[in-house]
Swiss-Prot record:
It is an enzyme of class 3 (hydrolase). It comes from Methanococcus maripaludis (strain C7 / ATCC BAA-1331). The lineage of its organism: Archaea, Methanobacteriati, Methanobacteriota, Methanomada group, Methanococci. The keyword Hydrolase applies. Pathway: Purine metabolism; IMP biosynthesis via de novo pathway; IMP from 5-formamido-1-(5-phospho-D-ribosyl)imidazole-4-carboxamide: step 1/1. Pfam families: IMP_cyclohyd. Its EC number is 3.5.4.10. This is IMP cyclohydrolase. GO terms for molecular function: IMP cyclohydrolase activity. It catalyses: IMP + H2O = 5-formamido-1-(5-phospho-D-ribosyl)imidazole-4-carboxamide. Keywords: Hydrolase, Purine biosynthesis. Catalyzes the cyclization of 5-formylamidoimidazole-4-carboxamide ribonucleotide to IMP. SUPFAM superfamilies: Archaeal IMP cyclohydrolase PurO. Gene3D superfamilies: Inosine monophosphate cyclohydrolase-like. InterPro entries: IMP_cyclohydrolase, IMP_cyclohydrolase-like, IMP_cyclohydrolase-like_sf.
Length: 201
């Protein structure tokens, strides 16, 4: 099944919260997730000239703000992070940013999806052409929600998978290799264990 870009939010078997963002793509497969600094992971084209072909293929997919991790499928990562820096509650930062940015104005009206994760709470959100939703979710060890731009743009217990891996690297590989979801390109994970751990593949 092809679900495009998606987020996986859950806990490892050991109970460590994580979020993984995976790029799955038919149109722009030549991209990489790159750790830019201690607080940022970006999605970049391998050929920088591709940046001029589509405004939606280059963006920060992960931002860390203190004890808060933000992961999304687009430039709204930075907007959410900025609002959290200003002191907005997570729900409000998500709501404001998604409503302000709206869905992507591409040929597919691609939804914007987002996750905000702390040690004690986890939020998921999206804005599509026909809907907007923010939801606080409870995480269970060894399980994870997934939220995608195509086919699975919902926040529901029906969109839960079992996840293997103890480290950020292992979780990233698991999500990249997850065969049910086609066309993997690159992925990035933030895992919370004695602070945030970043990994890309």
């Amino acid at each position: 099944m092809y679900i495009g870009r998606f987020l996986v939010l859950g806990k490892t078997d050991e109970g460590n919260p994580f979020v993984t963002y995976r790029v799955s793509s038919r149109s722009f497969p030549n991209r990489v997730a790159k750790v830019m600094d201690d607080n940022t992971v970006a999605i970049l084209p391998k050929d920088l000239e591709e940046m001029f072909k589509n405004p939606y293929i280059t963006y920060n997919c992960v931002k860390l703000v203190g004890d808060v991790a933000i992961a999304t499928n687009g430039s709204h990562t930075d907007i959410i992070a900025d609002k959290i820096k200003l002191g907005l509650p997570i729900r409000d930062a998500l709501s404001y940013s998604l409503l302000t940015m709206d869905y992507e104005k591409d040929d597919y009206n691609t939804p914007r999806i987002a996750v905000v994760l702390t040690k004690d709470s986890a939020y998921m959100g999206y804005v599509s052409e026909n809907d907007v939703r923010i939801k606080k979710v409870e995480l269970e060890s060894g399980k994870a929600y997934y939220l995608s731009v195509y086919e699975a743009c919902n926040i529901t217990k029906h969109q839960v998978i079992s996840v293997a891996g103890k480290t950020a690297e292992e979780v990233t590989k698991f999500v990249m290799d997850y065969e049910e979801f086609e066309k993997p390109v690159t992925a990035a994970t933030v895992l919370l264990k004695d602070g945030f751990k970043l990994a890309t593949l």
